[in-house]
From Swiss-Prot:
Subunit record text: U1 snRNP is composed of the 7 core Sm proteins B/B', D1, D2, D3, E, F and G that assemble in a heptameric protein ring on the Sm site of the small nuclear RNA to form the core snRNP, and at least 3 U1 snRNP-specific proteins U1-70K, U1-A and U1-C. U1-C interacts with U1 snRNA and the 5' splice-site region of the pre-mRNA.
Family recorded in the similarity comment: Belongs to the U1 small nuclear ribonucleoprotein C family.
Functional summary from the UniProt entry: Component of the spliceosomal U1 snRNP, which is essential for recognition of the pre-mRNA 5' splice-site and the subsequent assembly of the spliceosome. U1-C is directly involved in initial 5' splice-site recognition for both constitutive and regulated alternative splicing. The interaction with the 5' splice-site seems to precede base-pairing between the pre-mRNA and the U1 snRNA. Stimulates commitment or early (E) complex formation by stabilizing the base pairing of the 5' end of the U1 snRNA and the 5' splice-site region.
Keywords: Metal-binding, Nucleus, Ribonucleoprotein, RNA-binding, Zinc, Zinc-finger
Entry keyword tRNA-binding: no
Family matches, as SMART domains: ZnF_U1 (SM00451)
Organism, scientific name: Phytophthora infestans (strain T30-4) (Potato late blight agent)
Pfam family, one: zf-U1
SUPFAM superfamilies with a match to the protein in the record: beta-beta-alpha zinc fingers (SSF57667)
Protein name: U1 small nuclear ribonucleoprotein C
Biased composition (Pro residues): 79-113, 121-138
Length: 138
């Protein structure tokens, strides 16, 4: 059975299983070797990262980035904006403002006759009833 080789650590793993590979990848020695590997490419680009960012790994899906210290937008310390002002990412686009419709509750009472195309009961000869009787015969 082929053994697993780690390019970063330049070694073969002693336990070739998924659990063994995961444990190796979580180890401090492997993480340090990965950090050193990528630092050789970032050295000429001026990218500055502290060791904590490398060792923490990627952020879990759906998590928020860390908040900067100090007040933002004139709000309370900790980054909360003042009341009534949406957060930066939630600001509406510039332009005419359309307000959402206000819900006023259910209508009170039946609608008036003739309102909104409604009519009274059908008259003689209208669809839905028997034909009108003629005075001249059957």
């Amino acid at each position: 059975m082929p053994r697993y080789y780690c390019d970063y650590c330049d070694t073969y793993l002693t336990h070739d299983s998924q659990a063994g590979r995961k444990q190796h990848n979580r180890g401090w020695k492997h993480r340090e070797n990965v950090k050193l590997y990528y630092e050789q490419f970032l050295a000429g680009q001026g990218v500055i990262m502290n060791p904590g960012e490398w060792l923490r790994g990627p952020a879990p899906m759906g998590s928020l980035p860390p908040r900067p210290n100090g007040p933002m937008n004139g709000g309370m310390p900790g980054g909360y904006p003042p009341r009534g002002v949406p957060p930066r990412g939630m600001m509406p686009p510039p332009g005419p403002v359309m307000r959402p419709p206000m819900f006023r509750g259910p209508p009170r009472g039946p609608p008036p006759m003739g309102a909104m195309g409604m009519r009274g009961p059908p008259g003689p000869g209208a669809m839905g009833g028997p034909p009108p009787r003629s005075i001249y015969g059957p």
